[in-house]
């Protein structure tokens, strides 16, 4: 294994992680907001049966182990990217596994918001959309950034497991060389590189979460 091989594997892991997180955010953020706003006491109450179905679907997707989920979504992966093997193919199961997790993280962050802030906005005649976009999300931004950082670091771990289906990245190298060929030194290097990636993402995420916290800027 050369430095170029490790560098390309790091790039593949970074590419898959960032894209999967972005797609998970696109799906998970609105869903997480809906779980809070759609409550019977929320700013945009939805039918109880619909909220019940959403919660069940999220819980089911979150409860399936990632390796099994990858196999279960093979038909969906093939329909979207045309193959079930390779770096791009791993993005689909990663998104399916991560967006329910993101939705729960968003829900948790939004539920920590003081109800008085929302009530004040309602008393001033703000619409549900205005309350969500100009009150709930901005007020909970530090928590949301922290949640996205958690999701990002979790997806790094998932991406390593995707090496089982030839997903590329550090996971594939660790599996192909470290496990199948018993080259423990290569596996250790891959683990160290994954740990460093997690540390970098976590540090950057924590910095921006702190930077966006209005309470700490006073």
Where are these regions (language model features)?
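Short helix-to-coil transition segments within interhelical loops
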Residues: 110-140, 167, 180
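Transmembrane alpha-helices
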Residues: 18, 128-159
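Transmembrane alpha-helix signature in integral membrane proteins
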Residues: 7-38, 148
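C-terminal transmembrane helix and the adjacent membrane-cytosol boundary/short C-terminal tail
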Residues: 34-41, 187-218
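Glycine-rich helix-loop "coupling/hinge" segments at transmembrane-helix boundaries
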Residues: 158-188, 192-193, 213, 218
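Periplasmic/extracellular loop-to-transmembrane helix junction in inner-membrane transport proteins
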Residues: 1-20, 47-55
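Loop-to-helix entry region at the N-terminal start of transmembrane alpha-helices
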Residues: 8, 12-16, 59-62, 66-99, ...
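Cytoplasmic-entry segments and transmembrane alpha-helices of multi-pass inner-membrane transporters
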Residues: 34-72, 94, 99, 104-108
């Amino acid at each position: 294994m050369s430095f170029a091989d490790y560098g390309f594997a790091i790039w593949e892991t970074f590419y898959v992680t960032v894209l999967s997180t972005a797609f998970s955010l696109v799906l998970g953020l609105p869903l997480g907001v809906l779980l809070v706003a759609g409550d019977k006491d929320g700013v945009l109450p939805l039918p109880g049966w619909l909220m019940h179905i959403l919660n069940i679907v999220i819980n089911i997707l979150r409860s399936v182990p990632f390796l099994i989920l990858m196999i279960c979504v093979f038909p969906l992966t093939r329909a979207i990217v045309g193959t079930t093997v390779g770096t791009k193919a791993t993005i689909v199961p990663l998104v399916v596994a991560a967006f329910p997790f993101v939705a729960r993280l968003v829900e948790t962050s939004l539920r920590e918001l003081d109800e008085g802030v929302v009530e004040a906005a309602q008393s001033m005649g703000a619409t549900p959309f205005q309350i969500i976009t100009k009150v709930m999300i901005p007020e909970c931004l530090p928590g949301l950034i922290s949640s996205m950082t958690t999701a990002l670091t979790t997806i790094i771990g998932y991406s390593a497991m995707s090496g089982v289906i030839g997903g590329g990245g550090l996971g594939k190298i660790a599996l192909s060389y470290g496990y199948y060929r018993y080259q423990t030194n290569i596996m250790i290097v891959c683990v160290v590189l994954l740990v460093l990636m997690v540390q970098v993402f976590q540090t950057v995420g924590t910095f921006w979460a702190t930077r966006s916290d209005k309470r700490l800027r006073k």
